C-alpha cells in the first residue's frame, strides 16, 4: 500500500511538472536580452490557435512577484497593430472610471504603435494600492513568408511597497521617457 502511494505521488508530481512546462512557441530562445540584462523564459501559453504568449524575468525573480517582466505576444492573422492596441485602450478607458491611477499615453510612428500605461491592483475597499504596474508595449506588424500578424513586445515594471511605488512615481515624473526610449530601440524580435 505504501509503495502504491509513493508511486501515485511520483506520478502526480510528474503530471504537474508537465503542466508547467514552458514552451518556446515563438522560437526566441530561453533567454532574452534587454537593457544589458538576460531575462529567462519562465512562462508561455498558446491560448488560441492564432495567439502565443511568452514571459521572461531575471533569474533571481519570481513570476508571481517580479520587479520587471518582458512579455512577447504574437497574434497571427491579417491584423493591424492599431486594431490590437485599440482594444487595450478601450479597456483602460473603461477601467479609469473606477480607478483614477490608470493613465496612458500612446505613441505612433508609421505602422508601429507604443502604449505607455499605469495600472494598479487595489484593496477591496479601494483605499490601498497593493500593486502598481507600469507597462510599455510596442506593437509591430509582422509580414514574412512564414508568419503574418501583430507582435507585441512589452516591459512591465511592478512596485509592491509604498517606497517602491514612490520611486516608480518619481521615475515617471523625472525619467518617464527612459524606458520608452529603450523599448523604441529594440530590434523586432525574430519569431519563426
Which residues are covered by each model-predicted region?
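N-terminal "mature-domain start" segment
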Residues: 19-49
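Surface-exposed patches in mature extracellular/periplasmic domains of secreted proteins
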Residues: 42-44, 99-106
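Mid-chain, structured segments of secreted extracytoplasmic proteins
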Residues: 66-103
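Short, well-structured beta-strand
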Residues: 118-191
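Secretory pathway targeting signatures of secreted, lumenal, and periplasmic proteins
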Residues: 37-77
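Short, hydrophobic/aromatic-rich segments at coil-to-beta transitions
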Residues: 110-117
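Sec-dependent signal peptide recognition
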Residues: 2-8
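Hydrophobic h-region of N-terminal signal peptides that target proteins for export
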Residues: 10-18
Amino acid at each position: 500500500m505504501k509503495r502504491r502511494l509513493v508511486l501515485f505521488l511520483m506520478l502526480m508530481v510528474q503530471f504537474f511538472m508537465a503542466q508547467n512546462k514552458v514552451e518556446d512557441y515563438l522560437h526566441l530562445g530561453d533567454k532574452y536580452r534587454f537593457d544589458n540584462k538576460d531575462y529567462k523564459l519562465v512562462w508561455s501559453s498558446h491560448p488560441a490557435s492564432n495567439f502565443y504568449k511568452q514571459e521572461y524575468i531575471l533569474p533571481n525573480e519570481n513570476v508571481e512577484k517580479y520587479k520587471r517582466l518582458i512579455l512577447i505576444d504574437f497574434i497571427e492573422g491579417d491584423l493591424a497593430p492599431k486594431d490590437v492596441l485599440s482594444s487595450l485602450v478601450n479597456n483602460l478607458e473603461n477601467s479609469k472610471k473606477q480607478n483614477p491611477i490608470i493613465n496612458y499615453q500612446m505613441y505612433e510612428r508609421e505602422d508601429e504603435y507604443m502604449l505607455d500605461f499605469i495600472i494598479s491592483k487595489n484593496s477591496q475597499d479601494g483605499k490601498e494600492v497593493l500593486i502598481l504596474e507600469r507597462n510599455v508595449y510596442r506593437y509591430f506588424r509582422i509580414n514574412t513568408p512564414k508568419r503574418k500578424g501583430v507582435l507585441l513586445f512589452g516591459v512591465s515594471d511592478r512596485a509592491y511597497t509604498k517606497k517602491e511605488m514612490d520611486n516608480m512615481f518619481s521615475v515617471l515624473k523625472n525619467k518617464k521617457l527612459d524606458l520608452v526610449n529603450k523599448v523604441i530601440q529594440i530590434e523586432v524580435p525574430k519569431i519563426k
